[in-house]
Amino acid sequence: AGVARSSPRTARWAAAAAEDVPREREKFTDAAWSAMEEAPKVAERFGSQYVETEHVFMALLEQPTGALSARILEKAGVKSATALANAQAWAAKQPKVSVPGGTVEASSAGRSLVTMLTETNGASKLWKDKYISVEHLLFAFAKDTRCGQKIMQDLGLPMDKLKKAIDEVRGKS
């Protein structure tokens, strides 16, 4: 896997996070880091001043067809398009910031995202992985008390079923 460089935008919002939050590109797989870099753009599309968990989730689901996040959800019996629509509906209901004649730049990590990223450390240990991957981001999102648990519940995807799907896609079933 190639090494991607951090964009200034990603570096800014990630630097605002707490000390125990992984924020260096070198700690992520390429696909996971790609989602982290896309999340601020997703947040901006929804007029959010903060990058939050739903923005990372949507960035994961908007990755090219055949992406790992979609394969995991499909393995769990959830259509990725449905998951994306649910996350978009959630994001559309959140407070928005508007700038006359301009666009909002989402450059700060929200509290739930900071918590979710901290959770990725536990997920990487659970699977004994060196790098934070798409699977870890999905698993940590499902634990998010702000919106992840609600979205996953609406999709009929409890934690045990998600973990089983991750294990199966990883070839550990």
Residue ranges and their predicted role:
Residues 2-173:
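Histone-fold recognition with a strong bias for associated Lys/Arg-rich disordered tails
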